[in-house]
Swiss-Prot record:
Keywords: Cytoplasm, Lipid biosynthesis, Lipid metabolism, Phospholipid biosynthesis, Phospholipid metabolism, Transferase
Organism of derivation: Francisella tularensis subsp. novicida (strain U112)
Function: Catalyzes the reversible formation of acyl-phosphate (acyl-PO(4)) from acyl-[acyl-carrier-protein] (acyl-ACP). This enzyme utilizes acyl-ACP as fatty acyl donor, but not acyl-CoA.
A GO BP entry: fatty acid biosynthetic process
EC number: 2.3.1.274
Catalytic reactions of this protein: a fatty acyl-[ACP] + phosphate = an acyl phosphate + holo-[ACP]
GO MF entry, a single one: phosphate:acyl-[acyl carrier protein] acyltransferase activity
Annotated compartments: Cytoplasm
Name of the protein in question: Phosphate acyltransferase
Signal peptide bounds: none
GO CC, any one term: cytoplasm
Major subcellular location class: cytoplasm
Superkingdom, natural source: Bacteria
Transmembrane segments: none
């Protein structure tokens, strides 16, 4: 089965220097994939020619890449309202329009998160039964028994600062569907992020959401989960409001940077004698770093829309952006919006 994806080629901190090489690699590796690069035609064509020569991309592969002109770009610090109302020919807007028109099956952008969410919601609208879309991201999770690295899906990560219990319930359904499709499991475990595991703890919206989940046969509700267990493979989906989710995600990113800095500092300050066992342990460190490589987890989904939109990290490398493209392909294959719609009709 073939599939086509539009890419906001101008979006993100690095723009064409990330999106073009990522698109070329993805198309080269997947013969069923077609990509539409959306942006300033002259700039996109020039970058495409340059990178295709560097990567020695053959003509049959290049023939599966098209360019769609867009005269404007949404800045990373631009107001979502300005992006929606005034930049109707931005690379972001046009890429999403292609999803609405069914010219493509999905859109991937590394652009401004607020603008992407606002534009996607304005153009594509939400699925019936969904009040607000949510941002969901796959986090690395380690199973202490099997010693295997897995994924845990967490939502919302910033789209909705305040949520009702009904909205948290909707997020749980959407997250469960995504996890079931992505991880290939029939009944994904769903947990609510809370300050404790006891039933009486937490805000009213969380406790009321727990009651809704307990009464839903469709959801494999796993109770509350505390922040310290996010990376333990004890659940498949973690549900929270956008404020808590965004703060949690950025705290995780900061913690990883701190650990990396401390390791480097320790190595630099060690004596020559101490550096010998460190050098011997370098293969272990490299393997550990590979397992914690966030590039392999890039690609946040905007769930609850009538079409597929995947958000790449703004500062993503080409490898990381390529991962976001594969996330979009996965959602296309499982037709996530349609599956969510059908499931909501059964439980709401």
């Amino acid at each position: 089965m073939g599939y086509k994806i539009s890419i906001d080629a101008m979006g993100g901190d690095h723009g064409l220097n990330t999106t073009i090489p990522a698109a070329l690699e993805a198309v080269k590796k997947d013969s069923n994939l077609q990509i539409v690069l959306v942006g300033d035609h002259h700039k996109v064509k020039r970058a495409l020619d340059r990178y295709s020569k560097v990567k020695k991309i053959k003509l049959p592969v290049l023939q599966r890449i098209a360019i769609h002109h867009a005269s404007e770009t949404v800045g990373m610090d631009e107001s979502p309202s300005i992006a929606v109302r005034k930049k109707k020919d931005s690379s972001m807007r046009v890429a999403i329009n292609l999803v609405k028109d069914r010219t493509v099956d999905a859109c991937v952008s590394a652009g401004n998160t607020g603008a992407l969410m606002a534009t996607s919601k304005f153009v594509l609208k939400t699925i019936n039964g969904v009040d607000r879309p949510a941002i969901v991201y796959a986090l690395p999770a380690f199973n202490r028994e099997t010693k295997q690295l897995s994924k845990t899906y967490m939502l919302d990560l910033g789209a909705n600062v305040v949520c009702t219990s009904e909205q948290l319930f909707q997020f749980a359904i959407m997250g469960s569907i995504l996890a079931a499709s992505s991880k290939g499991i029939a009944e994904p475990r769903v947990s609510l992020l809370n300050i404790g595991e006891e039933e009486m703890k937490g805000l009213d919206n969380i406790k009321n959401a727990a009651k809704l989940l307990q009464g839903c046969d469709f959801i494999n509700y796993n109770g509350y989960i505390e922040g310290k267990y996010i990376f333990d493979d004890t659940t498949d989906v973690i549900v929270c409001d956008g404020f808590v989710g965004n703060v949690s995600l950025k705290t995780m990113e900061g913690s990883l940077r701190l650990i990396e800095s401390l390791i480097k500092k320790t190595i630099q300050e060690s004596s020559l004698l101490m550096k010998i066992p460190i050098v011997m342990a370098l293969p272990i460190f490299k393997k550990m770093k590979k397992g914690m490589n966030l590039d392999s987890f890039n690609g946040a989904s905007l769930l609850g829309l009538t079409g597929i939109v995947v958000k790449s990290h703004g500062g993503a490398s080409a490898n990381a952006f390529e991962t976001a493209i594969y996330e979009a392909i996965k959602e296309i294959k499982y037709n996530i919006p349609k599956t969510i719609q059908e499931s909501l009709e059964k439980v709401l």
